[in-house]
């Protein structure tokens, strides 16, 4: 009986320690990602995608402030700043991509136009996850 009680206390303590570590790690990573900018190259959706369904089920529309990213959750808000002119746009992730290596986002044409010229094709930007 005494051995069982001591074992239960040890297991409970171990679970509390592991849970504390897990929660602390999640909070630390989340805060770091939201407080600092990262650099990347971006592009925008081609005309042929207008009116097609995205991976989230939304219908893609050129004028909406949306973007594709490989891993960010659908609905995530991201601030993107053009390094060359400091113009910024806030987009919502609603699709998966881009497929080109070295690019973190494909923006809707409307979002891309807010920070750059479509004729440029790609832009060097910095970005941070807002929520």
Model features per residue range: what roles?
Residues 2-13, 19-131:
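Secreted/periplasmic proteins
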């Amino acid at each position: 009986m005494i051995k069982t009680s001591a074992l239960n206390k040890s297991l409970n303590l171990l679970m509390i320690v592991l849970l504390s570590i897990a929660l602390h790690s999640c909070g630390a990573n989340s805060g770091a990602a939201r407080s600092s900018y990262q650099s990347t190259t971006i592009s925008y959706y081609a005309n042929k995608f207008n009116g097609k369904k995205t991976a989230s089920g939304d219908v893609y529309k050129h004028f909406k402030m949306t973007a594709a990213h490989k891993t960010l959750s659908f609905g995530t808000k991201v601030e993107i700043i053009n390094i060359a002119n400091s113009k910024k746009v806030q987009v919502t992730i609603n699709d998966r991509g881009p497929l080109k290596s070295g690019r973190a986002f494909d923006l809707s044409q409307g979002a891309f136009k807010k920070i750059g010229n479509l004729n440029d094709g790609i832009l060097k930007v910095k970005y941070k996850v807002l929520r």
